[in-house]
Amino acid sequence: MNIYKWISLSSLTVCAMVLSGCQNPNSGGPDGLGGVSGTAIGDDVLLTDQNGLPSDGDRSMFEYVYFSYDSSGVESRETQKIEAVANYLNGNSSKGVILEGHCDERGSREYNLALGERRVLSVRDYLISLGVNDSAIQTKSYGEEDPLEMGHSKDAWGKNRCCVFAIYTK
């Protein structure tokens, strides 16, 4: 074997060994939780993000708040849904909520992330006006990135224009 082939093969082997030891940037750590860590609370584990904020919760407890196209205003027919969440949180001081804003696929990614944020802030403001402690409320906008309903129809778009309540134990 000539010297150039040997050097090339050796260099390739060393590079492969070095790269195989690198961590996947999407894994978030050796636990594979993508930047999420856990805190034990009794028998439950509260998943938190890199900022220590809750990253998950129970989404099945309350109805979603739906929004009109290109709107972040809470419509009067949706207020009773927010009031139900406020009543629950005001009566359960050990609970908190993550408000998750979703949009349909129309519009740019940046616009939809901002619209999802405006939607959750509208819901947040209403919850606070009903006496919910702002420290019990976290917000997250998915924009169009995490559709609740797949499809390219008016029905699918309508279902994706919403705020989801994810309840967690503090």
Sequence positions of predicted segments:
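Structural preference for long, well-ordered alpha-helical segments within the folded cores
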Residues: 81, 122-129
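Short, surface-exposed beta-strand segments enriched in small/polar/acidic residues
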Residues: 63-64, 82-119, 137-149
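Short, low-complexity, Pro/Ser/Thr/Gly-rich segments in the mature regions of secreted, periplasmic
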Residues: 158, 163-170
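Periplasmic peptidoglycan-binding/tethering modules of Gram-negative envelope proteins
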Residues: 23-96, 170
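C-terminal motif of bacterial Sec signal peptides marking the signal peptidase cleavage site
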Residues: 17-21
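Short proline/glycine-enriched turn/loop segments at secondary-structure junctions
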Residues: 151-156
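Bacterial N-terminal signal peptides that target proteins for export
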Residues: 1-10
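Short acidic capping loops at alpha-helix termini that bridge into adjacent secondary structure
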Residues: 134-138, 160
